[in-house]
């Protein structure tokens, strides 16, 4: 209700304090209020406060801590709530003592008409922080802006104005009871009750409104003026609530605190030193709270150390002060700290967390943990008083490494100690599953006793070198090895034999024995009562230690207690070790803020004053002034001159160097490794599409678009833009015109800054608006700033916090089906955790670097491993160096300035070193001995190299200074020294900050332009690569290097500031990644020769040719940690410092500038690449028909020539060498560790600060593991921390499955290896694959029944283009069906069939139904397409036209009479406006009269004459109805024939097609109806056109009588020709070529005397087409699927409109029997696509009346039944049931015909499939028809199907039947069945029984068909 213990009492009246204490006692249910006397008398507030000295708030502590600490070190329980915002509501409820549900709170209803929307007040005004963060809000004096949380809007904070008297105030006074607040939305004031206020702002609470529950945060403005979430408001409930989250341990838990005295006597509001972090127990494995109290050790958390400045206005905010416990209170409130000075009275103490459940069987008393925390009273032996001025007196801030057991309470000067949880998890051995134990080689996890662990710890500390610090990962492996040895020993013992344990009594002397070999660097202190004794003794000795006495580095304090067992901890006293451990506990952001604070508050003033004098004791500024005066106005000559040559500034500015065109500077080449990786990416995308998960449909897309998101670095943005422009990818993808691509490129590269949201929304709009474009979102350097949006509120002004998460993981991105996410990283470890969103199978790793050498690359990658290996090369000047002299200087300075961060000290020293080196090399040789040889060597090379030639080219030095403030200081200082020495025209100093563009002086820009031959006046360098050849120092700042590529002239990389603060793998390796590059092969193959090459080369170059523009690099420079040469004389050359050499002029045309090559990301390496290799960029995809898919080479002709020129030069003349890296000692010991082999390497460190190890027991990560293996290792053993963007991606609690984003890939490769070029190439080949390399499955089946065919004696000679009508008409018709789709159909009887042995036929024919064979083919430019194809050329076929265009079509009825149907038929045409020219309309009323037809004599090369009809059903999406490409874009008349009910769908998908809509009566009809109506309509139209044209004087026979009827699955057409036979006796091959439908039709339409042919067609393609099958160029046989039909000749031959199957075979047989010609062109073939939906599909046959939901399969024999029976009636067309029944009933209907092909079934006027075991003899009843010769044939059956009047009794009497032959008569109804029997006199020869009458199983409403069977007598 208003009490607060978040402050201390300053000078309050007794009554007020008493009142508040009484109220707190009454209201407190979970913890003890602060005693009244401690409020009054223990107030330590002695320090005046200055608001000007407030330090900006450091980032919140690591989220894995159980208690976050406040700025003074006391436990601030409220922070756990802040970090688990999503759990607020749960936490509230967990305070309840019972498990009963909370009583719901009933709110007063809102006033009528008021707004009730969450996030808005009742007046309808927005209160959400996201909406108001930029608003200027006026609040009355005395009010503060605070944030309220609504349970309905967990992600939002509501802004309120509250009177600060009712909040816990800044001065520690208790908040007044009650409430006073204003609504900042509508401005309403004077809310006196929080209940009333909560109603007004629509909090909609389910519990009683309390300000303590719902007012959560102070709101503060950032430096940018943005209102954002500030610190928590510390209500008492927030603190006590923590109890529920602490129930991991079964013992009471106390806290650690460090009350801190102001440093240096200042009172600036900053808590000096470091906070003591919390220790023994992490939170649960995922960083959250545990819901049940478990004694199982939790997964290790991760800890960080944070100096905690305050947001509030006093030093002591949030500090608890309590006196001794009183009996009436239930317990001592945990976390009570002490005053800042040690108190004489028994002071309240700070205590670390007690140890968790013992892991080993040591006798430890157990205390049950209840719902409230009840730590026991402090015992005298369990407290440690930290001595005053410990840090000041000793120069050491001790670090206490928590070991095993209960740490004591600390009080007094606790700011001078640090408690570190570094090794604590090593001692908490987790329970592992059996499979994990087996993997680790362990029998159990209970192998090590506490005594073993103590001895292992001591041995480890003894083994550490003087410059090393303990590493958790290293010690974990030691513990694991020990456990494995114990396991081996345990297995070796006989069964049941005990392993003798170490007794507690043996421990002290064994421990001392182990430490005795450490040369007094490790001490052991053994006590009997508690650890407090040992720690107190250690601190006392430290405070009394004299400066000349040697301190041990480590003191191991052991408590050998008989009651509690052995406990221990380690006190680190080593000057280097303690500082390094303390600093390594800070995250990068935290230590940068710490440095910033030290600079802002003037804490560095002592250090700065120290460096105001030179090493010789002179005043530096005065000395520089004196040198400037001595030099006067002149400056050192810019180039081509010595350092002592001076010119005027005007002359220096006007000096123009010789032009040195770098030919391939602007060209972009893709090298073989990049192409290989791009293809891997492409194949992975294909794998996603093929996975069956339906997450990606590549056939849907015809275009590729992209966006590249990069971290917040201006240089990186410009660098990526350059790559995009140079690669030409925008033009290649068709995204931009070539003229505009350069300026439009900026749309495609976006940086993660505050403006990204709007840009990204534009991109996502494009994604939604273009469903047929596949978008690729490339997230480059994706490991940077991968923090979650939810934790963004804790970042306090971090500009990029959560932005990547907001973009990459937003719902729209995850759900967009046309968006691929490609995350690219050199250090992907933070993306490879247990919570990763990327499937491990979707990772694409760079190719093994040794394979690059095998591929014959001229340049090889030189990365981190190569740098480490180079230490073993034995060369005099290693590439990886540690400046020992510098490290000694640093060490001395750090002892003098123990309170400053070591990076500050290092940076000041580095500035001095470079300044003095400049002075020593120019004017003060006496300073030479005071610069380290390393620094002197670098500066000498830098300033002398431009003077050696007329080009003025030189080297680049990169100095890495992570702190922006320090970097600016370094730049200003070095620039000042340079200018005063007159070197401002000699070399440039550039600040490389991520936030700003490069700034280069005008005269240097002019020089760069000259070298480039760049005549663009406005050009300025925008990337580091643009600085190629410029002598310069780049001071690279920013938290992380962000993947910027440096030029080939980079020669030195100074990383001496990168030290113990960089103890994660990513942090350390990405720093060295700056220098990685491509080098000449010789450097890796023969390093000693290669690296000493340049010195020998120098001897050969004549002095007269010193004006060459080429530079050679010499690495023979002294370095301080191996064979350093410290010069003593003033001569530079004597000192061996400078030996840069030059190359002769004649070679310069052939040579590219030497030095290393930066292939990353894809630009202009001078690698020998023969241009032809990569011209075909899809050469891995070489389809048989893709000859047309060649692409232009990516590199320009100039670069190809240049690359070839390089390959012709003599090898070894110039060698591209890697830069030299100078490291700090800490980094060198980790990165150079391969040399010794014993030390840990960087790869064993925690992979990234945002992840945590899952278990302390895990196998080691080996250096030789492949990238893929490392990924699997990290995915198993690391988890995301709470602030990580992937933290929310937790496994499903039930299934354990993780949510993976199926369309997300990860490309990983070493830094600067060429990943950008690779993914740009990937975009290009992805596009090509979508457009040109689409594959299609076509049927690939050989013809059937080829052995039944009549061998025609008559045949035309090969090579004839058209059939000769005379010859062709004499050829017999081959009645056998050869189309493989009719494999299971009845054979058509011929004389040839009668002669074939039945056994062969039987054996051949009996086969199981099987899947039809298909083959994958490449679509060519002449393919027919479905709706999923879209391109610029065929826009008129685009699907989903807006509704406005649907009305562009008109509906026309067309009526004609049909003799077959016996009635008028009305069809509907839907004709788009654009197609109306094909039709004739009446002048009045626009009535459709006819469809225009051409003349036979027309000759138009850009048209085909025949209208194309395509019947289609069920394939509105998948039917191949887009004939634009197949017709080569020419005008043609194409009509879709669709059923009435499907018309809306087809109209939607094909709005620009002419539709012919069948009458509704044919909705359930088969394909026969469509073909029948097409033919009927066409004939009627032909007559209309003849009449119309006859009036115009055209003869009737001159009108074109043909139509094309084509299936909707015809995809490709081919032409075949027989190749010439060689002399060899092998069969001649055939050549095939893909052709267009247009050319096929035009060829067939040009057939001489074409009007005499009834049907023309082509054969079906199969892969085994041989010259034998093409022997006859034309066949007289069946044609299917694609026919030219002469509707005039076939006027009297009709399709059977009832048919569902075999309608074309039936029609062909009718046509042939009428004496008409059917011609098949064998030199053309048709490919049919395997379309899996729609078309000639079976009906699902089910009962008409469904009795139950379960559908029982209905067998074909149930499709018929006896008339009037109780049979289940079916819902299917009668004709369909009949045809399906006949296919399966041949055994019952025609038993004599089974496999009896000599005696076929006689079918009059019809062909029906009656099963593959039966042959059918087709006979026409028409007079003068040509039929097969039936003489001597005895038929086994007779089939009469709907026979007409031409069938008479006389006809039937001509045929002979076997005895027992069967008859089947089929009619429309029962009466016509009886009439037919009588009319045909069938009863004379056939016997009928009443039970032999059947009907199809339809109801009478559905008009069943009837049939009667009988037997021949």
From Swiss-Prot:
Start-end of Low complexity biased regions: 289-301, 1187-1200
Region (Disordered): 86-111, 281-309, 1097-1157, 1179-1207
Localization, UniProt: Membrane
Origin: domain of life: Eukaryota
One Pfam family, short name: GREB1_N
Annotated transmembrane regions: 1832-1852
CC per GO annotation: membrane
Major localisation: membrane
GO BP of this protein: branching involved in ureteric bud morphogenesis; cardiac muscle cell differentiation; cardiac ventricle development; embryonic heart tube development; epithelial tube morphogenesis; kidney development; male genitalia development; mesonephric duct development
Keyword Zinc: no
Keywords for this protein: Developmental protein, Membrane, Transmembrane, Transmembrane helix
Result of knocking out the encoding gene: Embryonic lethal at the homozygous state. At 13.5 dpc, all homozygous embryos are significantly smaller compared to wild-type and heterozygous littermates and present with exencephaly. Male and female embryos lack kidney and show absence of Wolffian and Muellerian ducts, respectively. However, mesonephric tubules are consistently observed. Some potential remnants of ureteric bud are present in most mutant embryos. In male mutant embryos, the gonads are severely affected, being small and with poorly organized sex-cords compared to wild-type littermates.
Signal peptide limits: none
Record's compositionally biased regions (Polar residues): 1118-1157
Topology in membrane: Single-pass membrane protein
Family membership: Belongs to the GREB1 family.
Described purpose of this protein according to its UniProt entry: Plays a major role in early metanephros and genital development.
Protein name, entry field: GREB1-like protein
